[in-house]
Amino acid sequence: MKLQESESVERRYINQYAMVAALTMPQNFIGILGRASAKTTQFQAMRIQQAVEECPGAPFVWVTDTYSNLHKNVIPSVLEGLRFLGWEMDREFVIDRQPPIEWQRQMYNVIDKYKQVMTFWNGFTFTFVSLDRPSIGAGRSYVGLFGDEVKYWPEEKFTNIRKAVRGYRARYGDSPWYRSLSLTSDMPNPNHTGEYTWMMKLVKLMNKEKIKLLLQTGQALNEARRRYAMSLQADDERAQQLSERNMRRWEERWTELRRGTTLFMVASTLINADVLGEEFFQEEIAAGLEGIDTNLLSIPQKLTADQKFYVTMTARDFYQDGTDNAVLEQHDYGWEQDCTVLRHLDLRMPLDGGMDDGNMKSMVFGQQRGREYRVMKEIYTLPPENERQLADKFLEYF
């Protein structure tokens, strides 16, 4: 008998690497994945769904580098990924507002403010925290940590936020999600200021033999679930009892193996080639832009001699308060930002600009105030866009 699609059985398409991540679903997932490989919408969204279903009432935290990135990219991508899995706003979850009272009753801890909090129907919560505004998550304890674009996190900031992932062992200590990590990023390049390679050290956490055993167990569990679903469709009571009993046994084995297990994965954008299409890669290669080997192919880079100057730059050379978060909070997630978010922009003063021409055309803009000079914004275009589109972006932003 062939398994038929129904209300309880649906067909989903994911790439092979996402399938491995789904079949193993380990306590820790560290994914260094090429650009446009569906890091958030597939890999992270599937882990979110599993964590929600297995940890009702648990508080989790999602961390990103800046509040601006959180507002514009991260939360919209999370929402898109959950929609892909069939979960909708106001049905399975709400965000930025107080949930229904029956949802609140299932929360393990009390929350008094719901700004940047996603709440699910069973009391599971996500608090979204940016490293440039860590006060939002200060003083709280979390069961697990999710994060994207980890290459932009300084190691010491990750270490500090990791200390908050300690909570509620009495309730969740036996869960594979207790003190779990779900981290994704594309390959960091040490030649680029502000990118950090410490994530590569986490490969030491992975036991290859245990991952192989976990994958085999996940495949056996998937087959047991398929047979159970077939018995339900056949309306065979005896077959249902036997297949359900077998499925529960495999679920116990699978859950036990997931505890304390880490999957460290490095993959290129080619894992998503079926979705992106051949033209995507042809255009990227034809443009000849720097970073294809790192951003798309996930090939680690060594520090070149001419870039060692930039590594000497420290935090004192940068300012962290350039975005006016109060302006962001007035707009919906995913809002296309303009110059009103620039905290230090003086509309009465001239705006300096400098352009770097080439395949990638970029312009940076800044202003001087006394002895301080702040670079405030970069605008760029990639082929086939040219100077006209670059000028349009400037006009739209400023």
Show which residues each predicted segment covers.
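Pre-P-loop entry segment of helicase/translocase ATPase cores
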Residues: 1-29
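Conserved P-loop
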Residues: 28-99
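Inter-Walker segment of RecA-like/P-loop motor cores
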Residues: 71-143
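Walker B catalytic acidic pair
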Residues: 148-149
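ASCE P-loop NTPase helicase motor core
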Residues: 152-272
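ATPase catalytic-site recognition across NTP-hydrolyzing enzymes
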Residues: 259-260, 266-353
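Gly/Thr-rich phosphate-binding beta-strand-loop-beta motif of the actin/hexokinase/Hsp70
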Residues: 342-370
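Nucleic-acid-processing active sites and adjacent nucleic-acid-binding tracks
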Residues: 347, 365-398
